[in-house]
């Protein structure tokens, strides 16, 4: 279910402050470390790199135009697929 249009997109305030500091030139342009997977990607984020936490480690995500409107967590998978169990009788 989509978010209501009257509410608008969501992004954490601390994340927006970090992005604004980089845009204004007050902070060095390095990956922005964040745990906020729920934040929506805004057009201001294009060209920046975010280090998004997946529960175990930080995965670097470079934001492009196609990612605008999606959430940061969509580009940092939390689960690893190790394959289905192999049938031992078929191997012989």
From Swiss-Prot:
Entry keyword set: Ribonucleoprotein, Ribosomal protein, RNA-binding, rRNA-binding
What GO terms in the biological process aspect are recorded for it?
Answer: ribosomal small subunit assembly; translation
UniProt keyword annotation of Endoplasmic reticulum present: no
Statement: the UniProt record of this protein carries the keyword Transmembrane helix: no
Q: Which GO terms of the molecular function aspect are on file?
A: rRNA binding; structural constituent of ribosome
Top-level taxon of the source organism: Bacteria
Q: Which residues form a coiled coil?
A: none
Q: Name one GO cellular component term.
A: small ribosomal subunit
Quote the InterPro entries the UniProt record gives: Ribosomal_uS19, Ribosomal_uS19_bac-type, Ribosomal_uS19_CS, Ribosomal_uS19_SF
PANTHER family per record = RIBOSOMAL PROTEIN S19P FAMILY MEMBER, SMALL RIBOSOMAL SUBUNIT PROTEIN US19M
HAMAP family given in the database record: Ribosomal_uS19
Give the protein family.
Answer: Belongs to the universal ribosomal protein uS19 family.
What this chain does, per the entry, is described as: Protein S19 forms a complex with S13 that binds strongly to the 16S ribosomal RNA.
Protein name from the UniProt record: Small ribosomal subunit protein uS19
Traced from the root, the source organism's taxonomic lineage reads: Bacteria, Bacillati, Mycoplasmatota, Mycoplasmoidales, Metamycoplasmataceae
Name of encoding gene = rpsS
